[in-house]
Every structure is written in C-alpha cells, then in structure tokens.
C-alpha cells in the first residue's frame, strides 16, 4: 500500500488514534498521512477539484485552511485580467465557460505573465494559469514547494515556472527582471506567533517596502489583505491603488484585494464582489463606487412605519465592510431606516429593480409582514405570532441575544440562519420599531 492508498482508506478515521497506532503500518509515514488527511478534509468543499484527486499532495493542514477557495482564486484571476468576476453557476446557466473552468487563455490575455511571490499551496497559481500565458510560482516553504511542483502539472498547469526565493529588497529585482511579469501577486503571511495582525508591515514579505520596486518596473501589483484591515488606512499606506476589491464568499467577507497600477493617480474605485454566488444576467456582477461618491450620496430616510408588503434589505458582509451606507439608498432607491441601523426598505417595485441589478448577490431581501412600535406589548404580540424566528437588534440599547430572550424565540425553535421569519428590533429615524419579515 502506498501513501495515497493509505490516505484514501483512512480518510474518515480518527487522526489521533491513527498516529497513536502508527506501528501497525511500518512502511507508511503515518504522521504525514494524518496531516494530508486533515488537509484534504479542509479542501473537500473549499477546493473540491483538488479533493477529487487523491494523488494531490497537501502536506500542511494549516496551508489548506488558509489557502484560497476555488471561487476566491478564480476571482483573483478575473481581477488580473480586468474582467468582472462571474460565478460558475452563472456561466453554467448561460452555457458559457467560467473563469474557474477555462483551460485555454482567451486571445486578449495570451501575453499576460503573472508572478505569484507567495505561492503557498498553489490554488491561486492554478487559477492564474488558466488566464495567463506564463505564471511564476514562488514559495520558500520546502514541503509546499515540493507539493506544488507535483500538483500543478498534474492539474494541467503546463505554463507554471517554479522558484524558491526568500523575497526581500535584495532578491526581488533579480526575480522580476528574469521573469518579466505584467502583474505581481502577493498574499503576505502573518509573522506574529498566532496573534491577529491587520497591518501589511507586520507581514512577510513586507509589500509596503517592496511596492515601489515593483511598480517602477511597470508591473501591476495585486495584494491580498486581511478582511479586517482598515480600508482608509490601506489606501493611505499603499501607492497608485486603482481598485480595492472587498470579496465576499459563503456569507463572509473573505479578503481585501488591492490592485495597484504604475502611474495611476486618480481616486481608487472600491469594488464589492461576491465570489460564491451567481448574479442576474443583466448585472455587472459587482458594485463599484469611490469614497467621494459615498460621501456625496444623498440618502432617503423613512418618514413613517414600513408597511406590510414592502421590502427590507439587509446588506451582506462585504457590502457592509465597504461602508457604502448612503450610496445603497441613493443608487438603488431604498430608504434608510436609521443612521446606524444599516437596514433599508422600499416598495416592491424599487426592490425588484435592485434584485435584478447589482444588489442581489450582496445581501438579503425580506418581505415585511408586520411593524409595531418597540415596547413590551409589541414584544409579547410578536413572541406569540412569530415563535422561533431569527432575531436581530440594530441601533438599540440591547443586543440581539437580549432581544431574543425577551421574545423567547429560542424556547420553541433553535435560532438559525435558515429560518424563513426574521424579527428586527431597530432604532430608526422615527423611533424604535419591531419588524417581522419573511425571506
């Protein structure tokens, strides 16, 4: 039995027990096998194409946890080519081929050369190779480097070159001059002993110290940052930022992507993108705006209680991260409920317009069922009429858990994100309200 067969045979076993009884398999590196099994479990839904091939080597479980998913890697490839990202479901519905499924670079991109300075497990390189003529994979970690050398050719990436250089101001010029990339990608690793770090200068390589060296060579620079990073601060720290992408997948804000272009001195465009959901055929697939547009946007505010049949919109994680709170109202004809509530309502007609456009992939739409002034009587009435509803408190002196306890919604049905009924307690411009709504 070889290592691959062992991994497949024991992929559902308890890993601690497997390692404890390693003597049963003297010809197998059981510790390595356990690490690979753990990594494969993380890749099963994240990068299902890799999981499907048992010969794909995943030597570090942590790398599998931290690597891009198929969708977020394909999103980066779309940014690299200047395309708006479309999820695979959209292309399947339109009888097209998604970026994630391309095997031949489109004619306009045949000359594109991409250098990935922080190759890692290689998922991003795998997607870059489908839209570029040549890709440079660079990684200092030896197990990851060896795994990528085996995995990427097996995955059909015949246009990838491999390098194992420690990126620094002294080594980077030679690497760039030899490969001559059009775009450089970097996903700096935290070097903080497990402590959360949201500053690029606290990561390795220090892209802040290298950005001028890259841009001065005429290369575009694409940098992945923590979704917790402060957008305004990043725009002050980095130069020539043309686009900043806030990427959502599976209901979470997964990453920030800064796209820098040599010589660009205009205002950065913020792009809210969803790497995990399909978008309507008439949508561009993202929401684009500048901080200046958000500042100048004049939102509409509710002047009376929302009525049954109206639509309630709750922005998703990426749209909320972008800070486009006034622009949502001004651009899509929705009314803000309150200054800090970040909920919006509108007529069925205006909501239909938003649903068919760019808002659909970036939040949840509800139909309002009932509205009442916030108070003890309304809480008792809602608890009786809407048992088991999900509960959210916005701009109130109590949090969602406290409101849930008042409504006793946990007593008959466990609160979960799949509930069709949602009760919002909201501080609005016209006072505090309880709103019952249906997905």
List each model region and its residues.
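SAM-dependent transferase fold signal centered on methyltransferase-like domains
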Residues: 1-439
């Amino acid at each position: 039995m070889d290592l691959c067969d062992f991994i497949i045979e024991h992929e559902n076993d308890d890993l601690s027990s497997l390692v404890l009884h390693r003597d049963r398999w003297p010809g197998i590196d059981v510790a390595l096998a356990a690490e690979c099994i753990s990594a494969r479990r993380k890749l099963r839904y994240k990068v299902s194409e890799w999981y499907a091939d048992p010969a794909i080597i995943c030597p570090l479980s942590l790398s599998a946890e931290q690597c891009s998913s198929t969708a977020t890697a394909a999103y980066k490839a779309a940014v690299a080519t200047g395309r708006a990202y479309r999820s695979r479901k959209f292309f399947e519905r339109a009888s097209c081929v998604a970026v994630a499924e391309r095997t031949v670079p489109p004619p306009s991109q045949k000359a594109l050369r991409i250098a990935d300075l922080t190759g890692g497990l290689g998922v991003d390189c795998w997607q870059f190779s489908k839209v570029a003529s040549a890709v440079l994979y660079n990684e200092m970690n030896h197990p990851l480097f060896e795994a990528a050398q085996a995995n990427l050719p097996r995955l059909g990436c015949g246009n990838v070159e491999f390098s194992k250089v420690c990126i620094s101001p002294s080594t980077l010029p030679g690497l760039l001059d030899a490969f001559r990339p059009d775009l450089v990608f970097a996903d700096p690793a935290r070097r903080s002993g497990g402590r959360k770090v949201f500053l690029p200068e606290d990561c390795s390589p220090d892209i802040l110290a290298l950005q001028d060296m890259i841009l001065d060579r005429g290369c575009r620079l694409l940098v992945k940052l923590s979704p917790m990073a402060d957008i305004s601060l990043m725009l002050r720290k980095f130069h020539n930022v043309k686009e900043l992408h806030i990427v959502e997948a599976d209901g979470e804000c997964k990453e920030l992507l800064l796209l820098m272009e040599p010589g660009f001195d205009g205002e950065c465009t913020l792009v809210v993108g969803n790497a995990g959901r399909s978008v309507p055929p008439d949508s561009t697939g993202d929401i684009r705006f500048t901080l200046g547009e958000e500042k100048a946007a004049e939102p509409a505010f509710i002047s009376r209680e929302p009525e049954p049949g109206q639509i309630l919109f709750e922005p998703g994680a990426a749209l909320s991260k972008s800070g486009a709170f006034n622009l949502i109202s001004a651009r899509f004809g929705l009314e803000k409920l309150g200054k800090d509530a970040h909920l919006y309502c509108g007529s069925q007609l205006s909501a239909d317009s938003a649903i068919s456009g760019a808002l659909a992939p970036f939040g949840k739409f509800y139909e309002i069922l009932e509205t009442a002034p916030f108070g003890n009587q309304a809480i008792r009435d809602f608890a009786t009429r809407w048992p088991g509803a999900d509960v959210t408190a916005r701009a109130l002196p109590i949090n969602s858990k406290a409101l849930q306890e008042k409504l006793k919604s946990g007593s008959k049905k466990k609160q979960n994100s799949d509930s069709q009924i949602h009760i919002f307690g909201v501080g609005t411009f016209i006072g505090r309200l309880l709103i019952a709504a249906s997905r």
